[in-house]
């Protein structure tokens, strides 16, 4: 007989706050690995930023770098993040790491489940206050990233875009690549920042930008359902 999971999960006993020295804060802990968008950390809701991106965009590496601790599991195999991971920073806000989207080798059932989790999280009554959309700086704009950016805009979620793996972009190509990304994603309400988990380029700036936009921002209410999004209908 399997134990029925509570829709509101408590912090695991093994999840202890880790002292860090990062642009986002001084302590961080994994508060909840959730397998459905309905699972939330126990207690009063805190402001939250959701981290989104294609599989293998470097989400886990970036989270570890910007939080200055190895809290997220890093794998060379795309699609290893298979739950919503809630990280509590300074007891002030949550960072939510989502499964990556767009990895063709992931089983369709899993892709649909991940897409459903993300859509429910973004459009639910207690949606995130901010989104960090990661795009691969080496590849330029991808259709799946365009779709997610549109989904976030339609849902009314303020967004910061970070171009990852910037250290792997040749110096001679950086200006052209950044212009292409900016033309697609950047506007006065949606800043774009090239970053590198390897060299630390622009990570302090990214951390301060996210924190400034989270702290003091009023909690969002229900986000309107988006007409289109990352979820695919099951056959």
List each model region and its residues.
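Glycine-rich, phosphate-binding/catalytic loops in enzymes
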Residues: 68-69, 80, 111-114, 148-152, ...
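Conserved C-terminal guanine-recognition region of P-loop GTPase G domains, centered on the G4
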Residues: 116-190
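Flexible beta-alpha connector loops of hexameric P-loop NTPases
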Residues: 101-111, 138, 167-170
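Amphipathic alpha-helical transducer elements in NTP-driven molecular machines
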Residues: 81, 111-115, 142, 200-203
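Canonical P-loop GTPase G-domain recognition
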Residues: 25-38, 168-223
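Residue-level signal for inorganic ion chemistry
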Residues: 87, 164, 206
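Conserved G1/Walker A P-loop phosphate-binding module
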Residues: 2-105, 215, 220-234
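Active-site glycine-centered loops adjacent to acidic/histidine catalytic or metal-binding residues
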Residues: 97, 164, 196
């Amino acid at each position: 007989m399997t134990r029925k999971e509570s829709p509101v999960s408590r912090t695991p006993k093994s999840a202890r706050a880790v002292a860090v020295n990062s642009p986002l804060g001084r302590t961080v802990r994994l508060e909840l690995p959730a397998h459905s968008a309905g699972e939330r950390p126990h207690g009063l809701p805190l402001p939250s930023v959701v981290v989104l991106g294609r599989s293998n965009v470097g989400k886990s590496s970036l989270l570890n770098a910007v939080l200055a601790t190895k809290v997220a599991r890093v794998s060379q195999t795309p699609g290893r993040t298979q739950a919503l991971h809630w990280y509590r920073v300074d007891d002030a806000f949550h960072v939510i790491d989502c499964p990556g989207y767009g990895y063709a080798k992931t089983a369709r059932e899993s892709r649909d489940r991940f897409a459903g989790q993300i859509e429910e999280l973004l459009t639910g009554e207690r949606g995130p206050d901010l989104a960090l959309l990661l795009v691969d700086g080496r590849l330029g704009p991808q259709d799946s990233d365009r779709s997610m950016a549109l989904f976030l805009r339609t849902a009314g979620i303020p967004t910061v875009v970070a171009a990852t793996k910037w250290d792997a972009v040749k110096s001679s190509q950086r200006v052209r690549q950044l212009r292409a990304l900016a033309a697609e994603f950047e506007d006065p309400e949606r800043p774009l920042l090239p970053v590198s988990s390897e060299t630390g380029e622009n990570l302090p700036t990214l951390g301060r930008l996210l924190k400034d936009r989270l702290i003091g921002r009023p909690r969002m209410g229900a986000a309107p359902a988006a007409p289109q999004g990352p979820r695919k209908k099951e056959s």
